UniProtKB/Swiss-Prot annotation:
The keyword Iron does not apply. Its EC number is 3.5.1.108. This is UDP-3-O-acyl-N-acetylglucosamine deacetylase. Belongs to the LpxC family. GO terms for molecular function: metal ion binding; UDP-3-O-acyl-N-acetylglucosamine deacetylase activity. It comes from Burkholderia ambifaria (strain MC40-6). The lineage of its organism: Bacteria, Pseudomonadati, Pseudomonadota, Betaproteobacteria, Burkholderiales.
Amino acid sequence: MLKQRTIKSIVKTVGIGLHSGRKIELTLRPAAPGTGIVFSRIDLPTPVDIPASAMSIGDTRLASVLQKDGARVSTVEHLMSACAGLGIDNLYVDVTAEEIPIMDGSAATFVFLIQSAGIEEQNAPKRFIKVTKPVEIRDGDKFARLDPYFGFKLKFSIDFRHPAVDKTGQELEVDFANTSYVREIARARTFGFAHEAEMLRELGLARGGSMDNAIVLDEYRILNNDGLRYDDEFVKHKMLDAIGDLYVVGHPLLASYTAYKSGHGLNNALLRELLAHEDAYEIVTFDDPQAAPKGFAFDAQTAFA
């Protein structure tokens, strides 16, 4: 059977919070089959476990924020994206603040941590959410949509009227049957505009933001000396975010995702719309790994390879 996966050993790192600017300790621990991805605020007087789920997402203005009993963990999307890309079903994430450290602004550090810990198959079937009917959410000209598809495919379009973004491409389509998440998506960094960063700092946000963890643009150009990691890094990062946003549903999706100018809020609304219609999806497993869509029958170290 196609099995669930966790990590083999505990792994730790330290990083800076994007919004707080504080040093944050992050620990990833193996979890039993059926656990899911569980974030734990170990800095609180009484630690609070917050399982990743579509219904636990609260604030989505600047990131995907998990909330439970007054506790919150912000900026979970990059780590969730890495878990999706490496096929991790079960994991404990211990964190000493209310946000996941931003690291380099991509999912690459989290991929490295998980691969360093080692990936272990577990004696339980991997459960997929198979979309059986189209589901769509719109907000003005923005939309996000899921269609039935035997695999995992994404098409994302952005619309940033900026010379540097225009030159790199505003649309990307990826089918993970023939695309490596680790090589083609994981290293794409978050991006922002210098004038917006100043406004956020005045509001007490983005205190940890810098060119070490984001692509920063002025009105005309990219300010980072090292330029871009991918020719189309902007739209690839939006896709990286979407993969993480969708993975909070609790299982990998078998679906085609299409989006125009979507963000954390619309992605979460799409998941809630899907879950609200029980006839739009079913839970499936694969007794024969070779019967699973290409890209999911991966080896022990890579997914979507």
